[in-house]
Amino acid sequence: MIGQAPAFWSRRNSLMGWVLSPIGALVGALTLKRMAGPSTGVPVPVICIGNPTVGGSGKTPTALMVLARLQEQGARPFALLRGHGGRLAGPVLVDPQTHTAADVGDEALLLAQATPTVVSRDRPAGAAHAVALGASHVVMDDGFQNPSLAKDVSLLVIDGEAGVGNGRVLPAGPLRAPLAPQLDRADALLVAGGGRCADALGRLAHSHGKVVLRGQVRPDPSVIATLEAGTVLAFAGIGRPQKLADTLAAAGVRIGRLQPFPDHHPYQPSDIAPLIAEAARERWQLVTTTKDHVRLADRRFADMAGAITALPVTMQLDAPEALDDILRLAEARAAARS
């Protein structure tokens, strides 16, 4: 869990990035050593949606897309998460009617609205629990750098605008480990959006022999239609809050102001009440992400919920058939393990 990314993470020649790079080299080496550790498998295909950096890249919309495609094919996939921001160690099957973000984390609540979802800090135990409950596939949202659960396919997601920042490893930059060896351990790269880094990322992945997918995060048009006539006050506590503003602006919505919060921020009424007051004063609509909105789904915010609009988004691939190829690869590898 991180707050706002330091500005120097996006600057190639920053002094702070250079000063911290020896620590980053150590962190990267330790992470790569950990990634080479032993794994435990389960008797169903395991598909990991990961990213090589910290912060928002579009993993959760990608996981939802993969889960939806498997469901369309008649499968019964389960989502598996560590449960960032939640207190439960698991394994536990998430119940959106009784669990809160404080229990299982915001991402798990969001995924549980679409498919059976297990939260477990011990990923092999979580996957085994999902299989015992009837999972045909396990789709991991994050966990690429954790070797404990054997993965049949790993799909990395990188934002096409942010890329990998300054290309350095934590804390000198946003990478969790050096990019090249992370790519070598993946099967495919999804470049989310057509930003300034998109083409270079695609070329790099191709040079490592990886399948490259291109996709766009699209907002729900019915919700956008309710926002187009006015101005919005947007707030978000995600890896890249600016992404919400960019999505709204690209859809033609006027933004009065963006209020960022740290990733996975545990909202309090004292955070939200001033935003509601400001929006009312300025005659703006208050809008946030679905991931933020699930953190407001408890009785402390009961009187505030009606004033906040959640903006659902979906990941849409430029070539959807490429996803089917990746899913078939996962199933073939799982069958070969059996």
From Swiss-Prot:
It is an enzyme of class 2 (transferase). One of its GO terms (cellular component) is plasma membrane. Pathway: Glycolipid biosynthesis; lipid IV(A) biosynthesis; lipid IV(A) from (3R)-3-hydroxytetradecanoyl-[acyl-carrier-protein] and UDP-N-acetyl-alpha-D-glucosamine: step 6/6. Keywords: ATP-binding, Kinase, Lipid A biosynthesis, Lipid biosynthesis, Lipid metabolism, Nucleotide-binding, Transferase. Its EC number is 2.7.1.130. ATP binds at residues 53-60. It catalyses: a lipid A disaccharide + ATP = a lipid IVA + ADP + H(+). GO terms for molecular function: ATP binding; tetraacyldisaccharide 4'-kinase activity. One of its GO terms (biological process) is lipopolysaccharide core region biosynthetic process. SUPFAM superfamilies: P-loop containing nucleoside triphosphate hydrolases. The keyword Nucleotide-binding applies. Transfers the gamma-phosphate of ATP to the 4'-position of a tetraacyldisaccharide 1-phosphate intermediate (termed DS-1-P) to form tetraacyldisaccharide 1,4'-bis-phosphate (lipid IVA). HAMAP family: LpxK. PANTHER family: TETRAACYLDISACCHARIDE 4'-KINASE, TETRAACYLDISACCHARIDE 4'-KINASE, MITOCHONDRIAL-RELATED. Belongs to the LpxK family. This is Tetraacyldisaccharide 4'-kinase.
